[in-house]
UniProtKB/Swiss-Prot annotation:
Organism: Spirogyra maxima (Green alga)
InterPro entries reported in the protein's UniProt record: NA-bd_OB-fold (IPR012340), RNA-binding_domain_S1_IF1 (IPR006196), S1_domain (IPR003029), TIF_IF1 (IPR004368)
Stated name of the protein: Translation initiation factor IF-1, chloroplastic
HAMAP family from the UniProt entry: IF_1
PANTHER family reported in the protein's UniProt record: TRANSLATION INITIATION FACTOR IF-1, CHLOROPLASTIC
Keywords: Chloroplast, Initiation factor, Plastid, Protein biosynthesis, RNA-binding, rRNA-binding
Domain S1-like: 1-72
Quaternary organization: Component of the 30S ribosomal translation pre-initiation complex which assembles on the 30S ribosome in the order IF-2 and IF-3, IF-1 and N-formylmethionyl-tRNA(fMet); mRNA recruitment can occur at any time during PIC assembly.
One GO CC term, this protein: chloroplast
Subcellular location: Plastid, Chloroplast
Entry-linked CDD domains: S1_IF1 (cd04451)
GO MF assignments: ribosome binding; rRNA binding; translation initiation factor activity
Length: 84
């Protein structure tokens, strides 16, 4: 169940840390320390440096968050198909 008072932002993984922790650069330029949510961990979704992710932040501590979704990166072939 999703909580109402969370702040959700998008960002890019910049560093992989031990214990499934990651440093994420948000779109506004801030860096946060984020861990993987249970659904991502349970479904063995790989998160690598450079991936775009959605991060939930608590309004009480904006320096820590939880990665809830890995965004799909459009490949070059997909963009060429759209042009034709």
């Amino acid at each position: 169940m999703k909580k109402q008072n969370l702040v959700e932002m998008e960002g890019t993984i910049t560093e992989s840390l031990p214990n499934a922790m990651f440093r994420v650069c948000l779109d506004n330029g801030c860096y946060v320390l984020a861990h993987i949510s249970g659904k991502i961990r349970r479904n063995y979704i790989r998160i690598l440096i450079g991936d775009r992710v959605k991060v939930e932040l608590s309004p009480y501590d904006l320096s820590k968050g939880r990665i809830t979704y890995r965004l799909r990166i459009k490949s070059i072939n997909d963009s060429n198909d759209l042009i034709k």
